[in-house]
């Protein structure tokens, strides 16, 4: 038998999920309920998955990039992910490798979502845009680390030149 507190939490989840679906529709999105009570939605060409818990929503941008465990760039990518995760916003997650040695890259962001928040459509647009910013920060950090590594290699062996630069 459920207690009144459990019933209240269940109602909050349903109400918050309904509010989120309505908000996403107002933004021109077409949200879909999927298994496990989650909601899938596309925004500006990116696919997001939302899971609800009380007044909180965990938003995932799943599998937007991948890398093989044997890729020589993996250490640099890990370092770039760590640097990007110091920024405010979504956390970038490097998943465990699958049976083929492929590691997916995801982003996750936990937000408060409640009817008392002003302008929920703008709030969600800003929230989604943080995902794009996190990806951009990852690319910026990766490219900066790549340049630093190339400078370090050039300084170690000045006679070793890149044949593509001739």
Residue map of PLM features:
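Short, highly charged C-terminal tails/helix-capping segments
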Residues: 141-166
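Charge-rich, low-complexity N-terminal segments
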Residues: 1-53
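Hydrophobic residues embedded in beta-strands of well-ordered beta-sheets
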Residues: 38-39, 57, 103-105
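A short acidic/glycine-rich loop-to-helix N-cap element
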Residues: 113-129
